[in-house]
Amino acid sequence: MSLHAARGGPHEDLSWSAIGRRAPRDVVTFGDREGGGGMRSAQQGPGAVRVDEASSASTFRELDEAFLQTQTKIWLGEVLHLRFGEDALVADLLADGELLFQVSKVLWKMLLKNNREQLKQSKVYIYERLSFGRSSGKYMPYSKVDSFLKICQILGLAGIDLFTPSDVVEKRNVRKVCICIRSVSKKSLILHLNVPDFDVVTYTISMPNYVVGGIRRNLEQTQYSSSSSSGYSPCARSKVLQQQIIFGGQNDQHEDTHYDSDEAESKLSLLEPEDSVNEDNFAAVLSQFNDAHNKGSEGYGESGCGKHGEKSLAESVGSLNIGIIDFEFMDSTPLIHDKESCSLLEPEDSVNEDNFAAVLSKFNDAPNKESKGYGESGRGKHGEKSLAESVGSLNIGIVDSEFMDSSPLIHDKESCSPLEPEGSVNEDNFTAVLSQFNDAPNKESEGYGESGCGKHGEKSLVESVGSLNIGIVDSEFMDSSPLIHDKESCSPLEPEDSVNEDNFAAVLSQFNDAPNKESEGYGESGRGKHGEKSLAESVGSLNIGIIDSEFMDSSPLIHDKESCFPLEPEGSVNEDNFTAVLSQFNDAPNKESEGYGESGCGKHGEKSLVESVGSLNIGIVDSEFMDSSPLIHDKESCSPLEPEDSVNEDNFTAVLSQFNDAPNKESEAYGESGCGKHGENSLDESVGSLNIGVIDSEFMDSSPLIHDKESCSPLEPEDSVNEDNFAAVLSQYSDGPNEGNEGYGESGHYKHEEKSLDESVGSLTIGIIDSEFMDSSRPIHDKESCSTGSAADQCSRTIPAKYELSSEESDSTGSHLVFDSGKNYLELNNHSVTDLERIYNGHATSVDQYVRGNGETLADHPKKEEAGLQKDTGTIAQHRDTLACDGESVCSSCEEPRRGLNGEPSDFSSESHSRLTPTHNTGGKLSMVSEHPVHNMESDMTGMASDSTNPELNPEASTRNEMDGSRSTDNPVEPENVAQDSATRGRPEGDAPRSGKGVLRSVAGGITLVGAVFFMFHLSAALLQKKQGGKLCDGHTISFGKICSEQRKGQEHGQRKRP
């Protein structure tokens, strides 16, 4: 059939039918219904039979076109996940080109996913256009249809299979468009694209969920009620056939394809996800299971998994009503028992408010007949009491979902398992469980105490547990608290023995009525002997307000030493059980206390523990506080304080009286271990009262409270001195000289003698302090060789002396100075000397009034003009003054070596004079003048001996200037030298040397001057070392004439040595 015939023109050859078979030549075929036509008659032979097939051919064509349009609409709906109306025509749907454009995008994405490498080399690209112009554009549908045609080309369709955009937009040839879409489907399947088959595609029947659930429920009900597993019953087969008739549709040959998955799922014997029970389908599931009982339940009880009798599953499950609950709650609760030998309760046997009556009647009607042997497995025998009395009512307010998972409510020991996971009891099933256990008591409860899990006598567990009332508690609290004792040899408390405010009286009466008969040997194991007193008196009520969950875990309340176990975890003391523990320890003292001190755990005598511990009152504290504070001393040879010996404001008096009444008899040897000897003084005097307000948790961690040095502990952390305790520490050292601990001071450290630690520390009151304060402060002196006197002692001695220095020593000493060329020496002389003030008898007087006269410039050598070196000599007016010693500067200079401006050690801080050297900076002002003429050159060498005056360029010279400025002068000067100084100050700054080579050549001439400067420093250090009084030195009259003569001699000497 030609294209012209398909478009409605006259057929040139109608011998090809719609199904592709060629018609016989002798049969006359008429044109199709689209008219047109002509008729071609074949050559007729004799006896030929003419058959007219015009009616059958037209009928087939009509059916063919209707099928194509129907399948096209279904195929487009399946690809695009759309649903079209029954009356919608394909021509109208495709006219705007939007559907074809959407199909092109879907196919393009599939092609990119499967054939990305091949499409990269293709020149045809399909992209989604953001806008096609105006929504009512005339040519917008043509552009969309063109995108679909490009996809057809990529898939490999030939030109004869394609259509033109006008066939769709103008609805000229809708049949050819449908045939093209069919070809696209076939090509896509060949390329393994996930598209439906055009020929077999059908509508996807949508059914409500309740209809599907009802069908499957009926199928499962029939199989559930069948006694054999041979397969479907005739009734079930009839129902399946009925469903196939209803939902089969016209294509019966595809029924197996549509319902394969349903039949496979219907063969499952278990419950599907849609069979979950909720409030809506509760009645339906209940009736379903009531009608289909499990007839094989008789053997179900023999497997040891609990016998439910003829009760249905609905009664054992009921309606699960979950309001606001965390998803992890059901996952974390250990409701399912996973032991192989015994599974009393299955997961569906959980008890709640709804199935309370059902479970009650179940257990009353069908008790476990093997309960007599239950006790033989070692799973706890509570006597004739019921489980409800041994558990009580668990009242939980706001609790994290991980609480039940983390709480160690289940005892996992093999020999003794009092409670199974399925035995959880709450307020709702209290009566049911009570009646259950009352009807089936355990008769072998007498042997329960022999298993070593604690013997409660005939008392029930509820008296030892009571009601657990938890307010707002972190989920990790129960997990982290060490409530369970896991030692093999001794397990005094089981998890159910926790004591609180509610069951205090019950536990008290329980332990009073049934004391542990083996308590006499309990003390021998080294775990503290409580005598005949009950556990309630030693534990009391644990009252926790708002506390972090890690507090109980991190606090080192348990002593882990092998030789000494003074307190077990249950021995914690607080404000509530203060009186109980006091009476307990007073009435039943530890008889082995004499040997207790010998183990190195501290000897408290006959005093009770409460006096050494007191009441621990914690308000709002960080959880890491107890963990980070190193309160436990871990040395083997000396353990002065145990964890229970912590002292605060509350137990201050108790600890004071305890240690005063019961001193440590081994204190004489205690000092010999190298841990500090405090004599016979009490602990309170050596510690004092520690008052901490709001403090960071890292404070105790960062502060070095534990001294770990073996041989030498000069200053403990408590000896740190700051502005607050300066007076106290000063008086301590002044009032407490070392009298009897001679060997202690010989190591080069301070000696505290018989003074207590409290006198050297005092009361440490900390308000709001940063945790890094104690860590960053460096209060400990770590030098071994330096142990000088105090600042007052150093400044209380005065040494007037005269020293001479030979020229050889001056030359050797001056060789350390380094010159730098090209520097203007006038800059040093420009420093103002009018601001200098002399200190005399505590009063400051300006020295400016003593400076008079004019200056004079020394004549330079003729050959030094090219170098530009100018040496100026200044004269100072006659004056006399004394310099008072500053205690702080002298003390600081004793401990710290001299440093340059950049932190480099100065050349003058050698061993010969490194101890006491003042480092007071005067900014280049007039310095001290000694009695020796050589020392007086310091004022002139400011402009002559150093050619690098800028402290940024020459830190060494700057250091020397700083040290020179620390000495003031009181000596008169000669009048003839005043003119020289004034002339030097009046010299312009622009007159600078032109070269630095002359400076290097005149070094020899300045060696004498340099030696004089260094000798002056050396002599100053010697004077400071031998001073005895409060004044550093006395001023003496110095003549500067000798200085000028020495300078001239040095110049002449340099001229002789020059080539």
UniProtKB/Swiss-Prot annotation:
Location of the region described as 7 X approximate repeats in the Swiss-Prot/TrEMBL record: 269-786
Biased composition (Polar residues): 907-924, 945-958
Subcellular location: Endoplasmic reticulum membrane
Transmembrane segments: 1003-1023
GO terms, molecular function: actin filament binding
Keywords (A to Z) from UniProt: Endoplasmic reticulum, Membrane, Repeat, Transmembrane, Transmembrane helix
Membrane topology: Single-pass membrane protein
Gene Ontology annotations of biological process type: actin crosslink formation
SUPFAM superfamilies per UniProt: Calponin-homology domain, CH-domain
Entry function: Cereal endosperm protein required for the ring-shaped distribution of 22 kDa alpha- and 16 kDa gamma-zeins in protein bodies.
PANTHER family assigned to the protein according to its UniProt record, in alphabetical order: GAS2-LIKE PROTEIN PICKLED EGGS, TRANSGELIN
Free-text domain note: The seven repeat domain is responsible for dimerization.
Protein name stated in the entry: Protein OPAQUE10
Lineage of producing organism: Eukaryota, Viridiplantae, Streptophyta, Embryophyta, Tracheophyta
Gene: O10
